[in-house]
Amino acid sequence: MRFSRKLLGPFVGSLAKKLDYYSQFQPSSLTIQQYLDFGRIGTSANSYTFLKNELLVRLANIMQEFTLLPPKLLQMPSSKMVSNWYAESFEDLLLFEASDSSPEQVARFNDQLTVVLKRHAHVVETMAEGLIELRESDGVDIASEKGIQYFLDRFYINRISIRMLQNQHLVVFGNVLPESPRHVGCIDPACDVESVVYDAFENARFLCDRYYLTSPSMKLEMHNAVEKGKPISIVAVPSHLYHMMFELFKNAMRATVEYHGVDDDLPDIKVYVVKGQEDLSIKICDRGGGVSRTILERLYNYMYSTAPPPPRDGTQAPLAGYGYGLPLSRLYARYFLGDLFLVSMEGHGTDACIYLKAVPVEASEVLPIYSTSSRRNLTMGPQVADWSHHVPGQGNRPAQS
């Protein structure tokens, strides 16, 4: 069964019926411990049986929300491209809806997952281009911007979760090699936090040196309050932690160099890592001049960036200038019930704080669920002011049950 792919946004016909069906189900939130345990003792057939349904549920939940975006955004070429990618992937996975779990079917499924992963490799950049096209064509009103911000947080954390399922399955039960023999899929049961911090710092420093011809140094302090004197390790997805640290180091270095100048002695970036009974806490402190509270609120907005817009000829690093670095990093932190936030002192510097669950059984996926509440948040019009002045938000933390 194949559906027509004529600019499917909003999705129509038989595809819409399947979306309606699968969006009635809530996604199954897994813990890192569950991922780890299944990777060690699960079978390819059981993983296939779970994934062929769960991927359709997660896709359907977010695709239904996609149809509620402002019509002007859905008409942008890049947005249409993304909607078509999702429709095509949903169709591809529907082919396995009623199939058995024979080794031949599992092998075909693995091949299809690889195709889907490659198809969605540039979803973030392409969706960002859609927003740029919208701004350049007609602008965005405040009500639409709030709805878009709400959707994109959910859309990207949904994408993180889907890629986690796919990569974990393909590494454990497919032909994709793990990063190291110790890894269970994408998960490191004993992730060396200090090593990830240094890798992220050195790579960010390389970019800073190449662009500014100088860079600040780092002072790192580690404190293990659980096993005193021992190195800090946790069960984690190292690539997620690296993504967050690399982004925060880039921001701290850029702010430090631009505030103090390339000819001055640059103050160190100070990093504190503490492992407690419940949390792994990381704080990155720079003396890059900080930002005002007005700007601080906007740093998580997908339609705002402190950098110039990226060139469209591919000469700049992906995401540079899109304004996606911080909001995406926050989603990586929140994905397993952690968090990321900034505290800034204008005229001095900024502290960036990351919290991750130190206990893997408590690190549950935070997943968007298509519901009456999500429909209302995506479609509500301008709100009548009930304060004399704008009241700053409290970090826009996701609701927890």
From Swiss-Prot:
Its main location: mitochondrion. Pfam families: BCDHK_Adom3, HATPase_c. It is an enzyme of class 2 (transferase). ATP binds at residues 247-254, 286, 305-306, 321-326. GO terms for biological process: regulation of acetyl-CoA biosynthetic process from pyruvate; regulation of glucose metabolic process. It catalyses: L-seryl-[pyruvate dehydrogenase E1 alpha subunit] + ATP = O-phospho-L-seryl-[pyruvate dehydrogenase E1 alpha subunit] + ADP + H(+). The lineage of its organism: Eukaryota, Metazoa, Ecdysozoa, Nematoda, Chromadorea. Gene3D superfamilies: Alpha-ketoacid/pyruvate dehydrogenase kinase, N-terminal domain (1.20.140.20), Histidine kinase-like ATPase, C-terminal domain (3.30.565.10). This is Probable [pyruvate dehydrogenase (acetyl-transferring)] kinase, mitochondrial.
